[in-house]
Regions:
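Bacterial N-terminal signal peptides that target proteins for export
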Residues: 2-10
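Hydrophobic pocket/interface hotspot
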Residues: 53, 65-66, 73, 85, ...
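Short beta-strand segments enriched in hydrophobic/aromatic residues
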Residues: 69, 123-125, 160
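Exposed beta-sheet edge and beta->alpha loop/turn motif
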Residues: 122-152
Length: 174
């Protein structure tokens, strides 16, 4: 009887030791899945960042857009001179927000590349700001982001079809 109890207790302790060791030293396969989950989490954070950035453009608060940039960040649109620093970026955002009081910016997609993140967007609104034409506009474009170590935009190079934009300002959306 003592021998059976000893065997049961020994087996129990060995099983417990294996379980504890396994929990403290995950297999390579489990470690790989942790890496994938971490990568997915980072992608999810970036996707959320993009959605919130688009929402900031809709807020009629230019400083909300600028807050997504590093304090020394830059924004250039269609290869024009970059706006550098949050105050200058807020001025660019204010220009669009004033021209389109009903501005809606939607994130169409966010594509992570080795050298940049591509933020694809569509802007819709009615040009009813001061000196506006009253025309409705719907234009799509992209910003190529370089992010800093804090996860803010350090550099954004934006582009959209300026000829189509100007046509829509005159006669509206097709």
């Amino acid at each position: 009887m003592k021998n059976k109890n000893f065997n049961c207790i020994t087996t129990l302790f060995m099983t417990l030791a294996i379980v504890i060791t396994s929990c403290n030293n995950p297999s390579k396969e489990a470690q790989g899945s942790q890496t994938i989950n971490k990568e997915n989490m980072e992608n999810e954070k970036l996707l959320q960042f993009g959605k919130q950035y688009a929402a900031a453009w809709c807020s009629q608060q230019p400083d909300s857009v600028a807050a997504y940039f590093s304090p020394t960040g830059s924004l250039s649109v269609n290869a024009n001179t970059p706006a550098v620093g949050r105050q200058a970026i807020a001025k660019v955002a204010a220009g669009f927000m004033t021209a389109f009081p009903d501005i809606i910016v939607v994130m169409d997609s966010l594509i992570t590349k080795p050298d940049a993140t591509a933020f694809h967007w569509t802007l819709t609104g009615t040009n009813t700001g001061p000196g506006g034409t009253g025309s409705k506009v719907s234009i799509s474009g992209v910003e190529m982001w370089q992010l800093d170590t804090a996860g803010l935009i350090q550099k954004s190079k934006g582009s959209f079809d300026a000829d189509e934009y100007n046509r829509q300002l005159k006669v509206g959306v097709k």
